[in-house]
């Protein structure tokens, strides 16, 4: 099992992530690969020296930020038969998280597994992704209080979906390689959705597992879409998805009822 964590500076954030893994992981046969991406703070490299051991190693990506390319690079360095993509701004909060992910991912028909993620204020950040929400794809139950189960208890039930976020996503290595990894044209947005859709095209299931829970301090490293260049890049990624996945965007997500709204995240009824 190989855990891939891209990182740029933010040593404190990464440290919180790694300590939570160490504290709350009951499955021991794993390695952690930190994919270093152009950090500038000296304390970051000092931190790397402190943490490297038999389980943790650092590899260096020296090109511009491209989430897809960075993780594809990390996957090539990995030794495990299973790959876990994990953001550096995550904090594990369920003890059997890795065992749970692995037990689901080992099912023959499963290609990838995602988790239930919360913001630090204990509201939902991710409980699965529906194609079409927000125009291309969006997370459901965003902002719902932790403990609430949502429409038909969907937030609390393990289920097959069309996509889950790569902020915490486990895959069989063989499946990742079968589909050619992440699409590097999608540098930041929708690369996880595109990956999941390609995995589904090959006949594998995408599973949302609510029993795996983590906090997500979202976009601490990447930042917001707050410049003209970032806005242009984001628009290009939207156009990529609309051109490559026109059928599912036109016909609707097979994991979502067509009578429900794509304008809201809470499974509200569509109102014409």
What spans do the regions from the language model cover?
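Acidic donor-binding segment of Leloir-type glycosyltransferases
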Residues: 22-63
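Glycine-rich, basic loop-to-helix element that forms the pyrophosphate-binding segment
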Residues: 61-78, 96
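Active-site acidic Asp-centered loop
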Residues: 37, 86-89, 183
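Conserved donor NDP-sugar-binding/catalytic core segment of glycosyltransferases
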Residues: 90-136
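A conserved hydrophobic helix/loop-capping motif in glycosyltransferases and polysaccharide synthases
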Residues: 2-13, 17, 23-25, 34-37, ...
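C-terminal, non-catalytic tails of nucleotide-sugar-dependent glycosyltransferases
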Residues: 1, 111, 121, 133-160, ...
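Short aromatic/hydrophobic "clamp" motif used to bind/position activated sugar donors
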Residues: 83
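A short, conserved alpha-helix in the catalytic core of glycosyltransferases
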Residues: 97-101, 155-180, 185-215
């Amino acid at each position: 099992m190989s855990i891939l964590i891209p990182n740029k500076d933010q040593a404190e954030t990464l440290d919180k992530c790694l300590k939570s893994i160490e504290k709350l992981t009951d499955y021991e046969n794993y390695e952690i690969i930190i994919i270093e991406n152009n950090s500038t703070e000296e304390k970051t490299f000092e931190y790397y020296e402190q943490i490297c051991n038999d389980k943790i190693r650092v590899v260096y990506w020296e090109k511009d930020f491209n989430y897809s390319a960075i993780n594809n690079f990390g996957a090539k360095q990995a030794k495990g038969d299973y790959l876990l993509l994990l953001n550096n701004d995550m904090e594990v909060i369920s003890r059997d998280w890795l065992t749970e992910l692995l037990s689901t991912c080992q099912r023959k028909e499963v290609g990838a597994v995602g988790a239930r993620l919360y913001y630090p204020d204990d509201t939902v950040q991710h409980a699965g992704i529906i194609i079409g929400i927000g125009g291309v794809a969006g997370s459901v139950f965003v902002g719902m209080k932790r403990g609430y189960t949502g429409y038909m208890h969907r937030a609390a039930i393990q289920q097959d979906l069309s996509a889950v976020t790569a902020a915490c996503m486990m895959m069989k290595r063989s499946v990742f390689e079968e589909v050619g990894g992440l699409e590097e044209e999608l540098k930041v947005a929708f690369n996880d959705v595109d990956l999941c859709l390609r995995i589904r095209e090959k006949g594998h299931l995408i599973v949302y597992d609510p029993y795996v829970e983590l906090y997500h301090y979202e976009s601490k490293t990447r930042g917001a879409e707050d410049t003209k260049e970032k806005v242009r890049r984001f628009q290009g990624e939207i156009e990529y998805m609309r051109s490559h996945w026109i059928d599912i965007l036109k016909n609707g997500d097979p994991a979502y009822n067509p009578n429900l709204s794509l304008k809201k995240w809470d499974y509200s009824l569509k109102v014409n």
